[in-house]
């Protein structure tokens, strides 16, 4: 995504997308990939959205970066996606500034913005961490629905084992930036082989209590 500046510069290895190394292509070509080829959902949508522009304006600007489109056409596409995601008041979301929406609604709007160009790959960086449990469940359902509707491959970065169980087909466990375990989600979660993976799973609180009869 190119968001980290010099300190986050990749100095070794490749980032492969559609048979090309993203690190080797010009910035102009990278811009075509971001959004249209690879979408991104950030951990805190409120921080990633511009506070002085409405959601509708930001959607229109995002779409204009990739295709020639009128404001009315952009709105029609956005409203259609809002409806598919079961937004209760699509017009209000379109007209609102981020600070006028709840954290959960901002996150849902961020998901919609990430999917407007129907990218084949969607990165989700801790998309539920800043949300309460009920909104987390809703956001997970919406991402699963997007995968079903559009065939999107979702790469989710999370420490939430519940989200992993709900969404993941394949699971990669990292420790200090290195892979310690990789396999199907069911295998890794139910039969972990690496000590670090086992410790992660043991750290999940167990909702159990003893009942005397």
Predicted features and spans:
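A short, surface-exposed alpha-helical micro-motif characterized by mixed small hydrophobic
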Residues: 164-166
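Catalytic Walker B motif of ABC-type/P-loop ATPase nucleotide-binding domains
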Residues: 122-125
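Helical segment within the ABC ATPase nucleotide-binding domain
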Residues: 137-150, 162
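ABC ATPase "signature
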Residues: 182-183, 191
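A short, proline-enriched helix->beta-strand linker immediately N-terminal to the Walker B motif
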Residues: 116-120
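Conserved ABC transporter NBD signature motif
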Residues: 9-21
